[in-house]
Design a protein with these regions (language model features):
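Glycine-rich short-loop/terminal segments
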Residues: 11-16, 28
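Short, hydrophobic/glycine-enriched beta-strand segments
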Residues: 14-23, 48-49
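Acidic/glycine-enriched connector segments
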Residues: 25-188
């Protein structure tokens, strides 16, 4: 899980990483901080949400490092967390009810502008899985830190995702299948970057 490139390339200047994760995960271990440090070292742009949990913890870490190449995505005119006083991008949704679909509008836009994803997932959060799916559908690779066994997985295809999902309890896999119809999800792997 702890692999880094030794130098940046010119084409990395335009790399944007979508960072997200479960609201239940608010502590960053050495593995996650190492990956965040790789992002800083390579001067990647970061797009991140404003939720409590992983978003807030990662914002706190980047703020402590003085990292400025970050844009915080918020819904409508309300930004819940922006710990580094970074630029914000406010996303509008046609629905007013602040439910999963409301916040998924912001997630779709972040996935659209990203070139790569870094997700910190507890194996239960459907919002984090939705971010993974959004990125894979656009043939963008995703590094997933899977907190139950503290492992990292680089996903580039639906086959890669299927391997990771097998680590989730069957009750959660059934819930994901109902929510996202994963059995019909198919994406072939494309080349990507390393974090």
């Amino acid at each position: 899980c702890v692999r880094a490139r030794t130098h940046a390339h010119e084409d990395d200047l335009m790399t944007t990483v979508l960072i997200g994760g479960s609201r239940r995960l608010a502590l960053l271990n050495d593995i996650i901080r190492f990956r965040a440090d790789n992002i800083i070292r390579q001067h990647f742009a970061v797009v991140i949400g404003d939720a409590n949990g992983t978003d807030k913890a990662m914002q706190s870490y980047f703020a402590s490092k003085g990292y400025r190449n970050i844009t915080v995505y918020c819904m409508a005119d309300r930004c819940r967390n922006n710990l580094g006083d970074w630029p914000t991008r406010h996303i509008s949704a046609s629905r007013q009810k602040r439910d999963f679909a409301y916040y998924a509008t912001k997630d779709e836009e972040m996935a659209r502008v990203a070139s790569y994803g870094f997700m910190i997932w507890d194996g239960k959060s459907k919002g984090t899985l939705n971010n993974i799916l959004n990125l894979l559908k656009q043939q963008k690779k995703v590094l997933v830190y899977f907190s139950p066994d503290q492992s990292c997985h680089t996903l580039g295809s639906s086959d890669d995702l299927a391997v990771l999902l097998r680590k989730c309890p069957s009750i959660d896999r059934r819930k994901f299948e109902r929510e996202f119809t994963l059995s019909t999800f198919a994406v072939a792997e494309e080349p990507g970057i390393d974090l």
